[in-house]
Amino acid sequence: MANIFEVPQPGNDLLEKANKVRLASIEISQTENQNRIKALNFMADYLEKNSYEILDANNADYSSAQKKGISRALLSRLKLSKLKLNSGIEGVRKVGDLADPVNQVQIKRELSKGLFLERKTVPIGVLGVIFESRPDAVMQISSLAIRSGNGVMLKGGSEANLTNTAIVKALQEGLNASGLDKNAICLLTSRKDSMAMLNLEKYINLIIPRGSNELVKFIQENTRIPVLGHADGICHLFIDIEANLEMALSVALDSKIQYPAACNAIETLLLHKDIAPTFLEKAIPLFKSNDVKLIGDMRSVELGVKYEASLEDWKTEYLDLILSIKIVDDLEEAITHIQKYSSKHTDGIITENSHTANKFMNVIDSAGVFHNCSTRFADGFRYGFGAEVGISTQTLPPRGPVGLEGLVTYKYFLKGDGNIVDDFSSGKAIYTHKDL
């Protein structure tokens, strides 16, 4: 690991950039709600004005990546079509339609006569986001950061440098036109800077890595800055004996092929032994016609799956048109397999038996547990969050798709009238603890 990634000390140029973002984040944290919404609309406007430059930059990045032999999964994430760009721009505007996450009063309580406590949401400060390939993530992350009153330092994959630079330039122009400090959004383009970010604990309040398992684990182990993220997206779908066969086929197919490079696409399909023969008879040609390579355990190979799986396959995130299949004796074996290999991202079950579904959903300790629907629904936009800055598989909150609510923290505001603790110790004053 140390041979691949190193954590250098930040140079003066990076320190200067980080300080500018920190100062801009302080300004934005004090900005009224309507001004942050205004900024998002200007950011969207300037993305539209610069759309041809952005698409040209992406074409250049994509062509270069193809020549370098980058994997199909990364190429899929890198490609920014006109449709995807327009969707991203619309997403920036829609973030402005979401409820303001800042200054929300969570607790309002009279502690005693003349002593009042409030707990209110406040921006985190500066986000450091490291991600691979997907240039549309720049729009998502930046809009969520500004909406929640935060600054953001971005580091995308080098294969998308031209695209990311064009997008950030447009976003900064929009911020500036709206009257806010354009330095609230900063793009880093070198690997050295992305690693040196890990030593910016005086400037960055939260690191959000969106990349390979290896990268995420390295970041988690090599920074004093809190890290929000997930290392793997090994998602499972269990087809129960009491599953509706047509539903099972449809959901399994969507969960794999709708966007195989996504972290919420399934990597392993578990089949109850009594439904496996009928299911595979229809599923094998269906997956084959969609160019999905099926890899299975011995029992599934005996039922027509072409390639035999190894132990490594059960813990592999393919991010491609490859699917591992395992036949299990019952629900308990399916649960045992998932508990052993799941990355705690999203796992689902197809069954008409509500008792079976409830047991599965209550026992499986993943951020998302789904019944009779595609795992591809595990997404901030589809959850109604507007967009997501990432997905967290940690047990402590925020968990699952992280939208605006995950980009604020809270502070306690206590207002008194000369109150002192000694008066309560001596009995001169009493606590009322009355919620207001």
Curated annotation (Swiss-Prot):
It is found in: Cytoplasm. It catalyses: L-glutamate 5-semialdehyde + phosphate + NADP(+) = L-glutamyl 5-phosphate + NADPH + H(+). It comes from the Bacteria. GO terms for cellular component: cytoplasm. One of its GO terms (molecular function) is glutamate-5-semialdehyde dehydrogenase activity. Keywords: Amino-acid biosynthesis, Cytoplasm, NADP, Oxidoreductase, Proline biosynthesis. Pathway: Amino-acid biosynthesis; L-proline biosynthesis; L-glutamate 5-semialdehyde from L-glutamate: step 2/2. Catalyzes the NADPH-dependent reduction of L-glutamate 5-phosphate into L-glutamate 5-semialdehyde and phosphate. The product spontaneously undergoes cyclization to form 1-pyrroline-5-carboxylate. Belongs to the gamma-glutamyl phosphate reductase family. This is Gamma-glutamyl phosphate reductase. The lineage of its organism: Bacteria, Bacillati, Cyanobacteriota, Cyanophyceae, Synechococcales.
